[in-house]
């Protein structure tokens, strides 16, 4: 079913934002894939959108009286973990970093110079905050590092685990809710449980995570596979009500620790959530399997899955609808080179 883009990111503008090229991104879809070689800015791109989105969600929430400038400044510093904000500006230039994003038919705009210390400069704030919780799932799993991340941020107040990790563990602390969930969420949770043959849960008394298989045998989280832990994170967020149909999910290197079969099933669930609930998703990858699976899913609906290809020294990224087929990219090029090398070695 088609959903309005009113609850989604519809436009973003980057200028002098670290290693990213200066560009405008208009063709934003329900599912957005970011590909590129190492050092092209995939994670920077995801973190920039996530920081702005979370700032909009924290703005005017409850009794919080902080200004948008204060929220953004803190979010950017702890997400990118820079000593001063000016370090985020593209190196070797004197012009300011500028960012703009349109979400919920409202804009957030900010800029700051290379000399900026702790505060962003000019800020355009939305009229109201967002009634949603978005989440960033990093490449590293967090369940076995749960207490370490919390201590690092809440006790030591030190850099090491950025806000993507800290926000995630705080969201995972929320206990699952009883009662009816969104149908698409409930279906996805069942599918997730089938993929990992059990579920991961939190023991309030011991303060530790554990894995329970389909035969109800319990295993310490340290003895549980990385793939199970990664998939279980989404299951927990669907179960505890942290995510809703206005949430935006950012996943960095979705293929990390997952077998290709699990990747395909995981992406099927992501597609179901995006299609039935209208949840928007941004995914980065180095995996051929992820790209190919999303191309196959994109054949179901035009303008539903967009691919952004970042390339070193390119003036702007290449953006295309995956409904039109596999994009040109270094992952495919490398696969072809290996195949050609195999042929040559066999001669």
For the regions a protein language model found, what residue spans apply to each?
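Phosphate-coordinating catalytic segments in nucleotide- and nucleic-acid-processing enzymes
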Residues: 2-13, 53-246, 313-347
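Walker B motif beta-strand of ABC-family P-loop ATPases
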Residues: 248-250
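Phosphate-binding P-loop
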Residues: 23-29, 241-243, 273-275
